[in-house]
């Protein structure tokens, strides 16, 4: 019999809590106790993912984004933590600690682009390294293709939408940071990167990055992070071979792209 705490210990080995940012809320956030035979790995715990876990008879969901982040002042049937407890499904959420972890979100992202001689930046969260020389538009197309192949397909539209800023030079040294990392363009420049690939970047990040000679690729928050779910599932299976670990097929990008 595998317990909730055994899985939590295994997840702490995969993504040590001491790697988390001080403002974050990772950990065992919903504990329904009991034995666990099957786990669902996801990026987000949405009502659709809870329903999927229940349908697949999973007693636990392991996610990247915390199902509880801000303090709860009230809770009801429309709230996902309520839905988890009602279904008897526990939740372990590993957020910024999984971003920074060895083999975590950003190392998985770096691996997609075959980065070599990797270093960390942004307080250990991001990764920067050498890649085979490539033009920015070609790298953006590669990001769209490779990430789409690793994400759940939407019901309508393309799986991944990529925006890019071309500073006019080929990319030999790439910085990656998943999610909302556009504000870290100066950190990428300080590490000698030619391009920063992230999930989200705003209008002013794009203008400033180009002005300073850094190309920027924004490939989507979901698309840059969902690929880690397969890696987490594989690590958890290796740690607890008797545990069945599935990857969510219902956890999709919340946006629909034209």
Show which residues each predicted segment covers.
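Hydrophobic structural segments
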Residues: 1-258
């Amino acid at each position: 019999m595998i317990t909730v705490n055994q899985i939590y210990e295994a997840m702490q080995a995969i993504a040590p809590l001491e790697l988390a940012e001080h403002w974050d809320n990772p950990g065992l956030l919903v504990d329904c106790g009991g034995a666990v035979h099957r786990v669902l790995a996801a990026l987000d715990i949405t009502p659709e993912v809870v329903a999927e876990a229940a349908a697949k008879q999973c007693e636990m969901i392991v996610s990247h984004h915390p199902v509880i982040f801000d303090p709860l002042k009230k809770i009801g049937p429309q709230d996902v933590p309520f839905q988890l407890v009602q279904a008897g499904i526990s939740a372990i959420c590993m957020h910024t600690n999984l971003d920074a972890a060895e083999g975590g979100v950003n190392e998985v992202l770096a691996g997609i682009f075959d980065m070599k001689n990797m270093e960390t930046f942004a307080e250990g969260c991001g990764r920067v390294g050498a890649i085979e020389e490539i033009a920015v538009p070609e790298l953006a197309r590669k990001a769209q293709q490779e990430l789409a192949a690793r994400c759940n397909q939407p019901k309508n539209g393309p799986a991944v939408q990529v925006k890019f800023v071309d500073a006019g030079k080929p990319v030999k040294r790439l910085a990656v940071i998943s999610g909302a990392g556009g504000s870290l363009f100066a950190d990428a420049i300080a590490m000698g990167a030619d391009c920063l690939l992230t999930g989200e970047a705003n209008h002013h990040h794009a203008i400033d990055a180009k002005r300073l000679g850094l190309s920027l690729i924004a490939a989507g928050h979901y698309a840059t992070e969902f690929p880690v779910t397969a890696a987490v599932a594989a690590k958890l299976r290796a740690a607890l071979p008797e545990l069945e670990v599935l990857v969510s097929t219902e956890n999709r990008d919340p946006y629909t792209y034209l």
